[in-house]
Regions:
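Aromatic "clamp/platform" in nucleotide-sugar-dependent glycosyltransferases that forms part
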Residues: 274
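Active-site proximal beta-strand in glycosyltransferases
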Residues: 91, 103-127
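Membrane-proximal helix-turn-helix segments that form the acceptor-binding/catalytic region
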Residues: 130-151
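Conserved acidic donor-binding segment of nucleotide-sugar-dependent glycosyltransferases
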Residues: 308-317, 325-331
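Conserved donor-binding/catalytic core segment of Leloir-type glycosyltransferases
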Residues: 188-205, 209-224
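Helix-loop-beta element that forms the nucleotide-linked donor phosphate-binding surface
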Residues: 146-147, 153, 159-179, 187
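Nucleotide-activated donor-binding/catalytic signature segment of Leloir-type glycosyltransferases, i.e.
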Residues: 232-257
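Short hydrophobic beta-strand element within catalytic cores of glycosyltransferases
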Residues: 291-294
């Protein structure tokens, strides 16, 4: 089977796409991969070098939520239709909801990694203000959901959110994200420290919660590259854990190997997000045997269940208390680290994710063939 996949290099979708593409090719599939957003750096595409059955087509079409997204959506749609005509895939795997209604004679599966309306609700606690752009966006996504052969979400919460915002799809499926466990080291001796990933200025990730109270153990936040917008708290920007008033150190973007080392050393991972449909970084932390301390939101409760410690929703005091309790009880910390590790290996591994997608591909393709 030949699958055309769309992706972008702006966030964790690229990591998810890499795991899926590698898994599909290992099972005999051919993959044409199209990326949007930004042209990736060479280190972001190095993984493709060993894949003979992968054709990669990078583009700079902007995503639907970016400035100029409306025009680029039209141009991107025309480009994809032409590419489908040229490459003749058996199925489209579209990692952007807006393209679900492409006028092409092949099945279309779209994956809801996130969207602007559900993001806004989660971050601001209210509906977004009406505008000409929002009207276009709602109409585009609703049409895409209605026309797609299947809509996939990485959690039941996200599937329900998409359904309530844009209507029901012809076929709905929940397929959890997955990572290859062999990439992570769960056996290194842990340091009594907390790791978090996200920009301090990102209201959805809200890692800034970790800076609002004095922490009892060192905390490292990765991804806060803009020093001018940091909260007013004493933090250091070097590569060592800070012993400042907040016990927080801030690092810029890290390579994957650097991140894996940080995961392997940190005893705890703080998932502070108020909007997290999938939680890829938490999967990576769990596969590194970090104990998870998570914001108490429905999506994270659904994904991690009893394999994590939860703090009161969006509450910095409760987060600091959870860190204090877990760091002070080594047996409890190891217990939760092992729970997260086992759950991630069983439920959120790349092999299982790929198998689930292949099953869906075959169902959708056979249904289309029968209908024809």
């Amino acid at each position: 089977m030949h699958v055309l996949i769309t992706s972008d290099t702006m966030n964790g979708i690229w990591t998810y796409t890499r795991e899926l593409a590698c898994g599909l090719i290992a099972r005999g599939f051919r993959v044409t991969l199209v990326s949007f957003g930004e042209i990736p750096m060479p280190e972001q595409t190095a993984w493709m070098d060993r894949l003979q059955d992968l054709r990669y087509v990078p583009t700079a079409f902007r995503l639907d939520w970016m400035d100029g997204g409306e025009q680029h959506f039209e141009e991107g749609s025309e480009f994809l239709c032409a590419l489908v005509k040229e490459t003749k895939p058996d199925l489209l795997h579209l990692n952007h909801l807006c393209y679900g209604a492409l006028s092409v004679p092949v099945p279309r599966i779209v994956v809801a990694h996130g969207d602007m309306v559900t993001w806004w609700r989660a971050v601001h606690g209210r509906e977004p203000k009406e505008s000409a752009w929002l009207k276009w966006y709602r109409k585009t996504i609703s049409h895409a959901v209605a026309e797609a052969d299947a809509v996939v979400a990485p959690s039941e919460w996200m599937q329900c959110a998409v359904r309530s915002s844009y209507g029901a799809a012809a076929r709905e499926s929940v397929i959890h994200h997955g990572r290859n466990p062999v990439l992570f080291n769960p056996y290194i001796q842990k340091e009594d420290s907390v790791l978090a990933i996200g920009r301090l200025v990102d209201p959805a990730k809200q890692v800034s919660l970790l800076t609002l109270q004095k922490q009892t153990v060192p905390v490292c936040i990765v991804g806060a590259e803009n020093a001018d917008h940091r909260p007013q708290a004493l933090m250091r920007t070097d590569v060592k854990f800070s012993d400042g008033n907040t016990g927080v150190a801030v690092r810029g973007a890290q390579t994957e190997s650097q991140l894996r080392l940080l995961y392997s050393k940190a005893a705890m991972y703080a998932g502070t997000a108020r909007y997290e449909p999938s939680g890829m970084t938490m999967i990576e932390a769990a596969l590194s045997r970090c104990a998870l301390i998570l914001n108490d939101i429905p999506a994270l409760r659904e994904i991690w269940g009893q394999a994590a410690v939860y703090f009161r929703t969006n509450d910095a005091d409760s987060l600091a208390e959870a860190v204090r309790i877990l760091s002070g009880d080594l047996q409890m910390r190891r217990n939760f680290a092992n729970r997260a590790f086992q759950r991630a290996r069983e439920c959120f591994n790349a092999h299982r994710m790929t198998d689930n997608y292949i099953q869906l591909y075959r169902k959708v393709a056979s249904q289309q063939a029968w209908a024809a």
